[in-house]
Amino acid sequence: MLNVVILAAGLGKRMQSDLPKVLHTLAGRPMLDHVIGSARQLQPARIIVVVGHGADRVKAAFEGLPGLQFALQQPQHGTGHAVQQAVPQLLEGDGEDDVTLVLYGDVPLVQPATLQNLLQARGRGVAVLTEVLADSTGYGRIVRDAQGQVCRIVEHKDASEAERAIKEVNTGILAAPTARLKDWLGRITNDNAQGEYYLTDVIGLAVGDGVPVGAAQPGASWETLGVNSRVQQAQLERAWQSELARRQLEAGVTLADPARFDVRGTLSCGRDVFIDVGCVFEGTVTLGDGVRVGPHCVLRDVAVQAGARIEAYSHLQQAKVGQEAVVGPYARLRPGADLGERSHVGNFVEIKNSVLQADSKANHLAYIGDADIGARVNVGAGTITCNYDGVNKHRTVIEDDAFIGSDTQLVAPVRVGKGATLGAGTTLTKDAPAGQLTISRARQSTIEGWKRPVKKS
């Protein structure tokens, strides 16, 4: 039976923020959410988050998730003291297979595969996740015996000069038999330079009890990087985005510049996708085969089908784009926009909660809201569907092959029949019959002999 304890009680003073440190984001998600996500992939019996500073805000952000519980550390007296607060909630089954994995809410990118390796390295004993660093300043050192076995971990402030020369460091992440961990946590002391209860002291206790201590290393160095400042947060953000870019490149996506590419959710791409510079992908985004995304676009929870083009500076949110459709430049698709195949939505066109069927076009300067637009419809520049009466929204229906002249207002609820034409400048307040020209502008007249006024002296 696997328990996961995530330490998330820290103040995060160096972040210079009122927001609890573990709620600061990485790739659009709270750091703690990344850790919980990795832990869930191990299918633990229980996840216990130890909270302290900003406990109510942290709990509010995650409360209600199945299998997730909270323990309060108040005040904070070190990592060992933090895990002690979770002890009453640890589950135990048949004994030997009961294990507790300790993770950190501010070390957000440790991957499930690395954690699986750590659990395997444990055998029937304890395992720690270690890293070899060129500069190990500030880290706890891994001390090994003459046989190369881990015998203890010494914190930097308590280390001798010889120990400080060690390059293998403790990441803080460990796995231990649950029953023994409970015993060791009851035996650790705060007799150290910091006056705190160190979780790392359980390693020395394990060795003293004859329990083997194994070690595993992460698949990549960025997996064990922690965040204690805005600088470190920014550095880790770039490291993670670089990794996400690498994965897309290896999957066959062309990125104009991998250093100017941001994913803040999940991005799934087909074959031969091209993504230009400065694009941001949020939520769940799917790009079909041959899709091209121009520079500086933002796509949030969007599905784009094969062969479509999203031109520069377009913003799409909760929208669908059909095959070979063209969006932009400078277009905005709001929630509920659904574009059919080969449809065109051009510059400064906004579409919300509307369907635009195959081969229809709104190429310039239009607002289409709460509308059902058929196939092969042309929407002229300056067209507005007037969908809101101040209280309720109303729908506009434009049937197949209709032609909407420029500078037209359609006051919903209203219907334009199949093949109908609306003359430029029309304000439509009643249904327009199929196949007919409907026009409502005033008749043009010329006033002969009219003179412009002149400025009085």
Curated annotation (Swiss-Prot):
Residues 252-457 are annotated as: N-acetyltransferase. Its EC number is 2.7.7.23, 2.3.1.157. It catalyses: alpha-D-glucosamine 1-phosphate + acetyl-CoA = N-acetyl-alpha-D-glucosamine 1-phosphate + CoA + H(+); N-acetyl-alpha-D-glucosamine 1-phosphate + UTP + H(+) = UDP-N-acetyl-alpha-D-glucosamine + diphosphate. Binds 1 Mg(2+) ion per subunit. The keyword Cell membrane does not apply. The active site is at H364 (proton acceptor). UDP-N-acetyl-alpha-D-glucosamine binds at residues 7-10, 21, 73, 78-79, 104-106, 140, 155, 170, 228, 334, 352, 367, 378. In the N-terminal section; belongs to the N-acetylglucosamine-1-phosphate uridyltransferase family. In the C-terminal section; belongs to the transferase hexapeptide repeat family. Homotrimer. HAMAP family: GlmU. This is Bifunctional protein GlmU. It comes from Bordetella parapertussis (strain 12822 / ATCC BAA-587 / NCTC 13253).
